[in-house]
Amino acid sequence: MSITAMDAKLQRILEESTCFGIGHDPNVKECKMCDVREQCKAKTQGMNVPTPTRKKPEDVAPAKEKPTTKKTTAKKSTAKEEKKETAPKAKETKAKPKSKPKKAKAPENPNLPNFKEMSFEELVELAKERNVEWKDYNSPNITRMRLIMALKASY
């Protein structure tokens, strides 16, 4: 068999197949995840590949029907039980969708300056004035954020 004939046969098998793994290709994502990839690989290398076909709906046998009759056991019912069964049920109320709890907003202090517009040096000066301690972190952004948080807590 020539290589082109094998490729054509594999192409036809893949087009008719319901499984990606019939024609094994180690570079394809589906083949890497497939449970039977070793079997497909062996079949593809030996070109002993069966040609699967999709089942038509009329070819599939209908499932056997189960008997609908059930054995019933006789129960002794009292008058109270009969009243409970015949009493009208209360209307079911639909649960109201719960609204998400709102985040609590921190009370805004009118004396609080706008920290976003301040430079890092200005923040450091303000921290020294208000006796606020802060820690230097590896990232200047984190250091700035922590300094601003400490300053807000001091107001």
Curated annotation (Swiss-Prot):
List compositional bias (Basic and acidic residues) regions by residue number. Answer: 55-68, 78-95
- Mind listing the UniProt keywords for this protein, alphabetically? DNA replication, Transcription, Transcription regulation
Report if keyword Transcription is assigned.
yes
Region annotated Disordered, chain positions: 41-114
Task: Determine if Transmembrane is one of this entry's keywords.
Answer: no
Any one of the GO BP annotations: DNA replication
What does this chain do? Required for late gene transcription and DNA replication.
Q: What is this protein called?
A: Gene 27 protein
Organism, as annotated: Bacillus phage SP01 (Bacteriophage SP01)
